[in-house]
Amino acid sequence: MQREEKQLEASLDALLNQVADLKNSLGSFIYKLENEYDRLTWPSVLDSFALLSGQLNTLNKVLKHEKTPLFRNQVIIPLVLSPDRDEDLMRQTEGRVPVFSHEVVPDHLRTKPDPEVEEQEKQLTTDAARIGADAAQKQIQSLNKMCSNLLEKISKEERESESGGLRPNKQTFNPGDTNALVAAVAFGKGLSNWRPSGSSGPGQPGQPGAGTILAGASGLPQVQMPGAPNQQQPMLSGVQMAQAGQPGKMPSGIKTNIKSASMHPYQR
């Protein structure tokens, strides 16, 4: 009897240590989520989850160990129930349970889930029993197929991202040409003042331009219409005006006013 009691105490101590470690890990993780959420990174969250998962697995191993007695065979009976505040209970429960009364005992010493939870569990069990074996197998195969396709897509994206990160990006432009183009557009660097023949302005020697054309056209006769002495209209070349005194022609009343090239209005 004493051997079983010692074994039970040792198992309880080991179980309490594992639960304390799990509680500390949960407390630190909750503190990070509430106070350090702005600096929290996804790798640190994964590390916290991995730590909690490892501690839960260790706790399950302790419970399933062959030297651990079956705690379900042990009976816990409350000896004293009081509505008054218990300081020792407050200290042991870290302020979560101030009193050990009739309202608290059913919640903390219950060995079965709540009646609502039991009802939901029964409903789920009944619904699962209604499904036939063939239909359940088809649903399982469909779910496995969807999961396999999803895992394949995720692994493909990971491989492509890793290969894209290792392979250097191919350059599709020449930086020298880009800089030269920007300098030419912004500052005119590398641009010359060359103009094609015939496009230069008047006054440039050696290049025929608009001034030469206008100078050649200055010799055209200008006809002054009667009644409009200040308006001069240039006549096209090749048009011959009838002169007075020519035989067979009527004397024209139009007077021609021929000016020299220096007096042409466009030659300034």
Curated annotation (Swiss-Prot):
GO molecular function, one term: transcription coregulator activity
Record key words, sorted: Activator, Coiled coil, Nucleus, Phosphoprotein, Transcription, Transcription regulation, Ubl conjugation pathway
Coiled coil ranges: 1-29, 133-163
Phosphoserine sites (modified residues): 82
Pfam families, per the entry: Med8 (PF10232)
Region Interaction with the Elongin BC complex: start-end pairs: 142-151
Pathways involved: Protein modification; protein ubiquitination
Region (Disordered): 156-176, 193-268
Gly residues bias (residue ranges): 200-209
Protein's cellular compartments: Nucleus
Function of the molecule: Component of the Mediator complex, a coactivator involved in the regulated transcription of nearly all RNA polymerase II-dependent genes. Mediator functions as a bridge to convey information from gene-specific regulatory proteins to the basal RNA polymerase II transcription machinery. Mediator is recruited to promoters by direct interactions with regulatory proteins and serves as a scaffold for the assembly of a functional preinitiation complex with RNA polymerase II and the general transcription factors.
Family to which the UniProt record says this protein belongs: Belongs to the Mediator complex subunit 8 family.
Name the record gives this protein: Mediator of RNA polymerase II transcription subunit 8
Organism: Mus musculus (Mouse)
Gene it is expressed from: Med8
